[in-house]
Amino acid sequence: MTKFIFVTGGVVSSLGKGITAASLAAVLEARGLKVTMTKMDPYINVDPGTMSPFQHGEVFVTEDGAETDLDLGYYERFLRHSKMSKTNNFTSGRIYQTVLNKERRGDYLGGTVQVIPHITDEIKHRIHASGEGHDIAIIEIGGTVGDIESLPFMEAVRQMQVELGRNRAMLMHLTLVPYISSAGETKTKPTQHSVKELRSIGLQPDVLICRSEHAIGEENRRKIALFTNVEERAVITCEDADTIYQIPRTLYEQDLDDIICERFGIDAPEADLSDWDKVVDGLLNAQGKVTVAIVGKYVELPDAYKSINEALLHAGITHKTQVEIDYVDAEALETDDSLLARLEQADSILVPGGFGERGKLGKMRAIKFARENKMPYLGICLGMQLAVIEYATNVLGLEADSTEFNRKAAEPIIGLITEWLDEKGELQVRTDDSDLGGTMRLGSQKAELVEGSKLHQIYGAKLITERHRHRYEMNNRYIEPLEQAGMSISGYSAKQHLVESVEIADHPWFIGVQFHPEFTSSPREGHPLFASFVKAAIDHQNI
């Protein structure tokens, strides 16, 4: 039966609960255990699909088309044998929506609907469902202990600990141990108060992960153990690392996996972390460096492009090359000529996905720069669409645009997808008046690559599967004039012949893809498209 590890955070947010939980999952998986992970988010939004990237960071898309928290990207990158799905991320909004729908249907037989038991029961039901078929399920609770929004989740965890017992449930609490530089001291009091807050709602941590900029020391570990009622060996120190991919070994060297296996009565072989050692070695001992200019409109918050950042990092590991990212504000690039110098200094240019017209002309300016200067270019989703618009405008001389920006465009080369088959093969229909949330072409879709194309060579296969998140697509009636002018279509959707990718034949490396390859990149395997893109940047640097 599935064992559950609940992960909470205290003192401050952004301590790295997701990374720590994923690192633990990687160590347990390395011991031969079947591990899955779930993120519970206390906010009222049904999902993060319509949330601003400035507030929430990127939206990570799963194989089955769920728009989820970016932490699920960490989960997939750290786990080799477990893919996330719709069951692995849910919010307060989703829980309340489900409970209210049941109330409207009469499922509660006229009873008074309350937080306890109805909301907490729905939370517990989803936790159990997410862990089915696995040895261990790690459940991360978003936010910080003490947040009013997270109380129903904490109560559900408390109930599950009672119902499952010590041999099937345990609590891991992440906390900050700050270093006061003026006093030259590490302070344990915030951790003590954080655990006190947990205990006030009936939760006692079994493991403490103490985050700090500096070494905490054995004396402070003993002090924390004494005042929090946690076994001293279960007080795990986690100092700032050079790379997040060092964290699995950090946890392993402090026997966290042994503590968990002993608690759950699991007999499993020792973990082999040699793969992670190779990843860390590739990152920290790079033999060269390239710069990739990412031209977007959310550049003030790198988390908005988290999976792309990581995919470039993974490609760097493949080539033992440090990939430095220069974030260029697309909106500023529209009028600021001085930013062109940053494009000139880069070794390649990437325009990521996005929505809305803001920054459009700056992105197209960067695309034109890459095209005319034979600089490696990768366009993802909107980055592909704008590459098509730029080419049609400046090479074909058309008044081309997307109906996303101009519904009365003279040459609507990009338009709304009105019908497509989803990942289950079911017909989906959309109009301009459809809701924004949950109405896109989402999840894994098959694409057929044109034989002999650069993309076909990169993937080494004719049929590929990649994840999508878009509601606009290239208009097929422009395929012929584009191809006659030198921009070829290198991939189509397997069933409906939607354009999936474009490339320019007389350019060293110019590719646009409608899908999101960054969602399937991992530190141990990388991704062929990003690996080829970084190799093209290395080649361009050496010209």
UniProtKB/Swiss-Prot annotation:
Sorted UniProt keywords: ATP-binding, Glutamine amidotransferase, Ligase, Magnesium, Metal-binding, Nucleotide-binding, Pyrimidine biosynthesis
Assigned GO CC terms: cytosol
EC numbers: 6.3.4.2
GO BP, one annotated term: 'de novo' CTP biosynthetic process
Binding site for L-glutamine: G354, L382, G383, M384, Q385, E404, R471
Disulfide bonds: none
Binding site for UTP: S13, K187, T188, K189, P190, T191, Q192, K223
Domain Glutamine amidotransferase type-1: 291-543
Binding site for Mg(2+): D71, E140
Regulation: Allosterically activated by GTP, when glutamine is the substrate; GTP has no effect on the reaction when ammonia is the substrate. The allosteric effector GTP functions by stabilizing the protein conformation that binds the tetrahedral intermediate(s) formed during glutamine hydrolysis. Inhibited by the product CTP, via allosteric rather than competitive inhibition.
InterPro entries assigned: Class_I_gatase-like (IPR029062), CTP_synthase (IPR004468), CTP_synthase_N (IPR017456), GATASE (IPR017926), GATase1_CTP_Synthase (IPR033828), P-loop_NTPase (IPR027417)
Catalytic reaction(s) noted: UTP + L-glutamine + ATP + H2O = CTP + L-glutamate + ADP + phosphate + 2 H(+); L-glutamine + H2O = L-glutamate + NH4(+); UTP + NH4(+) + ATP = CTP + ADP + phosphate + 2 H(+)
Subunit: Homotetramer.
NCBIfam families, per database record: PRK05380.1, PyrG
Protein's name in the database: CTP synthase
Species of provenance: Psychrobacter sp. (strain PRwf-1)
Name of the encoding gene: pyrG
